[in-house]
Amino acid sequence: MVDIIFHYPFLGAMGDHSKKKPGTAMCVGCGSQIHDQFILRVSPDLEWHAACLKCAECSQYLDETCTCFVRDGKTYCKRDYVRLFGIKCAQCQVGFSSSDLVMRARDSVYHIECFRCSVCSRQLLPGDEFSLREHELLCRADHGLLLERAAAGSPRSPGPLPGTPPGLHLPDAGSGQQVSLRTHVHKQAEKTTRVRTVLNEKQLHTLRTCYAANPRPDALMKEQLVEMTGLSPRVIRVWFQNKRCKDKKKSILMKQLQQQQHSDKASLQGLTGTLLVAGSPSAHENAVQGSAVEVQTYQPPWKALSEFALQSDLDQPAFQQLVSFSESGSLGNSSGSDVTSLSSQLPDTPNSMVPSPVET
């Protein structure tokens, strides 16, 4: 139904239509009293001058010969109302005619030619499975590909390592290219090479057991580890530092992986579900949301009085004939034949009203 608002913003300066006196007609358009012979009435109690009732878009005059629509306090002709507020195709944004066949997908309506997959542009026929994602149609094949890509994730190029000078490039792993780092830092004097310390299984087991109990051992614990492993204090100190750094990097990486998995699951929530099945085309009967408001003509009370006066003027000759008949009867100048001819013109008395003779 068309929403008709009875309280309009412009009635404050033009007069309140709801507080009009009984028997008076106030124009909703200009707010003044209507003294015209005819009043255009829209809905039960909205009345206009004939010159005030017009379309808000094209200014076409509206009367009882055309269809009028009221929305948000404005009047529209049928053409502009369909153009502004009618149902449009979700693909081409063009309105429908009453003879068009449409395809429906949930709350969206499409032309038959516009009901296509947004990826491969294949027209979806009745019985085809499809999905509706962000107001875009996807056929079954493209829907499956989208699910696979979202589950696998798009490959990302590795970003620059922290602390790497600009201009350095690291090729992808497995490409077979040699990593080349070119810097503009001046070469420093060659330093003495350090001997790499190789730990055996027993030493590693001792250090790992101590690290599991306390990742930051104190000086007394380090002295005991020196006696137990036979390693230098510097080697033990560096091993604990490297172990703490590796564990910290591993925890950060695991946290990032968990966040990535959570975001992938959230992105897949809009894609999972049962595929829709295209139905048969249906006729688009209601091209306009709402029903038209009938515009009627209204005749004021004085119009009925004037018609009654005209009718009484037409009946005046018969009244004069009866008056002349009464005057002729009072003077006694009329003959019996005149009375008989005049009485023959009068209607006969019904039989039902003739009294029956009373038996004595």
From Swiss-Prot:
Positions of region (Disordered): 151-177, 328-360
Residues modified to Phosphoserine: S154, S157, S280
The keyword Acyltransferase is annotated on this UniProt entry: no
GO terms (BP aspect): axonogenesis; negative regulation of neuron differentiation; neuron differentiation; neuron fate commitment; neuron fate specification; positive regulation of transcription by RNA polymerase II; retinal ganglion cell axon guidance; spinal cord motor neuron cell fate specification
DNA-binding region: 192-251
GO molecular function terms attached to this record: cis-regulatory region sequence-specific DNA binding; DNA-binding transcription factor activity, RNA polymerase II-specific; metal ion binding; sequence-specific double-stranded DNA binding
UniProt keyword annotation of Phosphoprotein present: yes
Region (LIM-binding domain (LID)): 273-302
Sequence ranges assigned to domain LIM zinc-binding in this UniProt record: 25-86, 87-149
Record field: compositional bias (Polar residues): 338-360
Alphabetical UniProt keywords: Developmental protein, DNA-binding, Homeobox, LIM domain, Metal-binding, Nucleus, Phosphoprotein, Repeat, Zinc
GO annotations of cellular component type: nucleus
Low complexity composition-biased segments: 328-337
Subcellular location(s) of the protein: Nucleus
Domain of life: Eukaryota
PANTHER family: INSULIN GENE ENHANCER PROTEIN, INSULIN GENE ENHANCER PROTEIN ISL-2
Oligomeric form and interacting partners: Interacts with LHX4.
Function summary: Transcriptional factor that defines subclasses of motoneurons that segregate into columns in the spinal cord and select distinct axon pathways.
Protein name (Swiss-Prot/TrEMBL): Insulin gene enhancer protein ISL-2
Organism (species): Rattus norvegicus (Rat)
Gene designation per UniProt: Isl2
